[in-house]
Curated annotation (Swiss-Prot):
GO terms for biological process: tRNA methylation; tRNA wobble uridine modification. GO terms for molecular function: GTP binding; GTPase activity; metal ion binding. This is tRNA modification GTPase MnmE. It comes from Clostridium botulinum (strain Hall / ATCC 3502 / NCTC 13319 / Type A). Belongs to the TRAFAC class TrmE-Era-EngA-EngB-Septin-like GTPase superfamily. TrmE GTPase family. NCBIfam families: mnmE_trmE_thdF (TIGR00450), PRK05291.1-3 (NF003661), small_GTP (TIGR00231). Its EC number is 3.6.-.-. The gene is mnmE. Exhibits a very high intrinsic GTPase hydrolysis rate. Involved in the addition of a carboxymethylaminomethyl (cmnm) group at the wobble position (U34) of certain tRNAs, forming tRNA-cmnm(5)s(2)U34. Mg(2+) binds at S237, T258. Residues 223-383 form the TrmE-type G domain. PROSITE patterns: G_TRME.
Length: 461
């Protein structure tokens, strides 16, 4: 079977660096590496102890020429990440030696690993469950310390323990129902129905606790998609540069300088924010600028938050009003910029009165005035209070969806019991709820979906 092949892949980024690591896992991994390894004083790997390293050289089999100087580490299964015999070859960090060593491993009997196949083997061999496997990629992609800590908690199995606890309780309820149906002479159905409703309400409460922070968790995992919009030359690029502390965007007095979107991540108290600077939205005959304006509108549609910038030194016009109308159904913050010019927008203006004053901030991006207030406003809009790194937060949209479906099935079971329909029909809904939660840990998930999840991993992981 393919799952039992010995696999190999480069585990470090391709390119020049201090070292490269080639990982190999499977029953034949030690034999394969031994066949191309030559230690000091012709020492082999035959007597290498588990969880130790050995210095030597990788040799090309046919020519007997040395490819590179290496350190080989050996982890014996099942006490390894994949729960299989695993070796890692540490060679000099360069494209040529790394590729040549990998080529020799494949010529000697290994197969090139698919993306995420090492982590998939850890899952298939029962070393980790699916939620822990997904946490591996979240750790790699984490943008802030807080998002990394959240992923680490999931990798430790904190979410798995909570899910398994709820599923075990569901199984006990199902067993209780089946016992009641199998022994109707005891006439326990009515008593059992009332007890089950109480149990299900407690389960729903636990699921609700997990769902409640999942929107915040999704932001921790993927970043808050924030788009800066406004007419040309209101200070959008200056705001981006101020937030990232770098001159990423070109700033000039010429309207229409930004013709494409610029994206950068910033960290606000552990919250990853993807800031998108867009082309100024206005009517234009310039073909390139017109494309930029259309891209800006697309980014607004995708945004979690819109920062709408107005220029305090100029009067509001039809273009400002059109932009406001375009974003009115989004979460937004209005920045009244260029406060340093000592001119004041007429705040009695009907347009301003329509805006929620809680979301209006006067700023001078040039002088960094109002930026802290902006950051606090972003936090308050999306996060209820301070996020604690020791709390369990559901960060994965797939997990959130499974929790919601499980909750719906529990509610359906309660309705079935309340309608005094035969109690065994409620067990169908409870079993569905149990199955949906199992999708989080991978116990009840379709194999094709599991394959798709691991295909999104990088090679060597």
């Amino acid at each position: 079977m393919k799952e039992f092949d010995t696999i190999a892949a480069v585990a470090t980024p391709v390119g020049e660096g201090g070292i490269s690591i080639i990982r190999i896992s499977g029953d034949k991994s030690l034999d394969i590496v031994s066949s191309i390894f030559k230690g000091k004083n012709d020492r082999t790997l035959d007597d290498i102890k588990p969880y130790s390293m050995r210095y030597g050289f990788i040799i090309e089999k046919e020519s007997k020429e040395m490819i590179d100087e290496v350190l080989v580490s050996y982890m014996k299964g099942p006490r390894s990440f994949t729960a299989e015999d695993t070796l890692e070859i540490n060679c000099h960090g360069g494209v040529i030696p790394t590729k040549k060593i990998l080529k020799e491993l494949i010529k000697s009997g290994a197969r090139l690993a698919e993306p995420g196949e090492f982590t998939k083997r850890a899952f298939l061999n029962g070393r980790i469950d699916l939620s822990q496997a997904e946490a591996v990629i979240d750790i790699i992609r984490s943008k802030t310390d807080l998002s990394m800590k959240s992923a680490l908690k999931q990798a430790e199995g904190t979410l798995s323990k909570e899910i398994n606890s709820i599923r075990n309780r569901m199984i006990k309820i199902i067993a209780h129902i089946e016992a009641t149906v199998d022994y109707p002479e005891d006439d326990l159905e009515e008593i059992t129905g009332q007890k089950i409703k109480v149990d299900l309400k407690e389960i729903i409460n636990k699921i609700d606790n997990l769902i409640s922070a999942s929107e915040e968790g999704k932001i921790l995992r993927e970043g808050l998609n924030t788009v800066i919009v406004g007419k040309p030359n209101v200070g959008k690029s200056s705001l981006l540069n101020a937030l990232i502390n770098e001159n990423k965007a070109i700033v000039t007095e010429i309207p229409g300088t930004t013709r494409d979107v610029i994206e950068e991540y910033i960290n606000i108290d552990g919250i990853p924010i993807k800031i998108v600077d867009t082309a100024g939205i206005r009517e234009t005959e310039d073909v390139v600028e017109k494309i930029g304006v259309e891209k800006s509108k697309e980014k607004i549609d995708e945004a979690d938050l819109v920062i709408f910038m107005l220029d305090l030194s100029r009067k509001i016009d039809e273009e400002d009003i059109e932009i406001m109308d375009f974003i009115k159904n989004k979460k937004y913050i209005v920045l009244l910029n260029k406060l340093d010019l000592n001119k004041d927008l007429n705040e009695e203006n009907h347009f301003i009165k329509e805006l929620d004053s809680k979301y209006i901030i006067k700023t001078s991006v040039k002088n960094n005035s109002g930026l802290n207030e902006l950051k606090e406003c972003i936090k308050n809009l999306f996060f209820s209070g301070e996020i604690k790194s020791d709390e369990l937060i559901v960060t994965n949209a797939r997990h959130q969806e499974a929790l919601i479906r499980s909750r719906e099935s529990c509610i359906q079971a309660i309705e079935t019991l309340s309608d005094e329909i035969s109690i065994d029909l409620a067990s169908i809904d409870i079993r569905n709820a149990w199955k949906y939660l199992g999708e989080i840990t991978g116990d009840t998930l379709d194999e094709n979906i599991i394959d798709k999840i691991f295909s999104e991993f990088c090679l060597g992981k």
